[in-house]
Amino acid sequence: MTIPLIDAATPVRVRFCPSPTGTPHVGLIRTALFNWAYARHTGGKLVFRVEDTDAARDSEESYQQLLDALNWMGIDWDEGVEVGGPHEPYRQSQRSEIYQDVIAKLRDGGFVYESYSTPDEIEARHKAAGRDPKLGYDGFDRDLSAEQIAAFKAEGREAALRLRMPDEDITFTDLVRGEITFKAGSVPDFAVVRPNGAPLYTLTNPVDDALMGITHVLRGEDILSSTPRQIALYRALHAVGVADYLPEFGHLPYVMGQGNKKLSKRDPESSLFLLLEWGFIKEGLLNYLALLGWSLSADEDIFTVEELVKAFDVHDVLGNPARFDVKKAESINGTHVRLLAPEDFRGRLVPYLQAAELVSAELTERQSAVLTEVAPLVQERIQLLAEAPAILRFLFVADDDVEPAEDALKGLPENLVEVLDAAITAVEPLTEWNAETIQDALRTALIDDLGLKPRLAFGSVRTAMSGRRISPPLFESMVILGKESSLARLRRFRDR
């Protein structure tokens, strides 16, 4: 039994079809990104449908989180939930009648058969024959007689439906891994409908792909073993008039965590929303996720979304597992932070400052002015937006609320009081309060007159201003604070 393949003239249609369970993780979003990038690269369509037939695990909260995650990442779709399209509905829970119609066609065509065996019975038969009891279904019900079926029904048993797997090798060319063959008999007949009549994922997923005209199935490596089943089902669907062609399959590499273990939902870096909380921006995270199995070139790690779309081809995806390296992700994110337009960067800081209760829900005139002045000073110094509140806190709090950190107190000169007195004496007479006059006055008083090294001289003043060992540029920070506040902080630190 054969089925046509797609050809170069077939318009590309890819899909993203998650289950709404848990919170979105980076492996899932990487899959969405690769499908989106391939659709945009080829001028094709991305279909977003939701596999929500598991009532016990699916939730509307998770569904909303999927939408939020994709929207935040800038991954849009051409057809699917929320936007509609010619193949509605796009939630499996609303497609029951469609599946029942296909099931009836498969039954009429003889491609599925009733299976009454329970898991315990299958295991017992394997044991009795000296086989591994975990081998899976043994084909017992494949050719039941009418009498046997009647007997099972008389017992009150309900039958699952299984697809007849062909007694031949199944070979396909994976877009990522090349030619793959599953030997005849290596994949048992599999259930497509539960005894209660509800279709299983093994049926609904390929049926939806067929009816929606999906041309390329790009998904995680963990689903590779199900491909021969889907190819066999596709052939049956073609025979009953449901499928026009067999799509191409591409299995994306595993995303590994620390210690070369597959990235788990329990790993903090796997949570997209936690990465957002840490201060990743979508441009940086999108860039890094694209590197988990693909690259623009051998020596080019930094690229824009436009460059990704222009270059992305699923045939270039690597089959080897990709490791999620948090440090590299942060470094790439920092590069994209520095590429932001100043006003854009300033705006993105606001939610993090609000979360830290450093600014009000509606910025005051003073808060807005401070942020405008300081944003360019920190844009070159942070990798994650969530670093900003700790660095900038001293600019938004009262002078009396600046408390020096322990690490900032270490290494200060023994004559700290003398240093601070000299600093106060140097800047108090200044009539022009700008970075240049402040720097000249402090350099003369602390380095030339007291003979201090710059680190000790300016480190003392920095700690007085910010309470930190590291801060935005010192003299510019003092300009933002103003003369009165700067002197108040020097005196307070001197008198502590």
Swiss-Prot record:
Q: What is its main location?
A: cytoplasm
The answer on whether this UniProt entry bears the keyword Nucleotide-binding reads: yes
Documented EC number(s): 6.1.1.17
Leading EC class: ligase
> Where along the sequence does the record place the motif called 'KMSKS' region?
262-266
The entry assigns this protein to a family as follows: Belongs to the class-I aminoacyl-tRNA synthetase family. Glutamate--tRNA ligase type 1 subfamily.
Q: Which PANTHER family match?
A: GLUTAMATE--TRNA LIGASE, GLUTAMATE--TRNA LIGASE, MITOCHONDRIAL-RELATED
Matching entries from HAMAP family are given as:
Glu_tRNA_synth_type1
Role: Catalyzes the attachment of glutamate to tRNA(Glu) in a two-step reaction: glutamate is first activated by ATP to form Glu-AMP and then transferred to the acceptor end of tRNA(Glu).
Descriptive protein name: Glutamate--tRNA ligase
This protein's species is Renibacterium salmoninarum (strain ATCC 33209 / DSM 20767 / JCM 11484 / NBRC 15589 / NCIMB 2235)
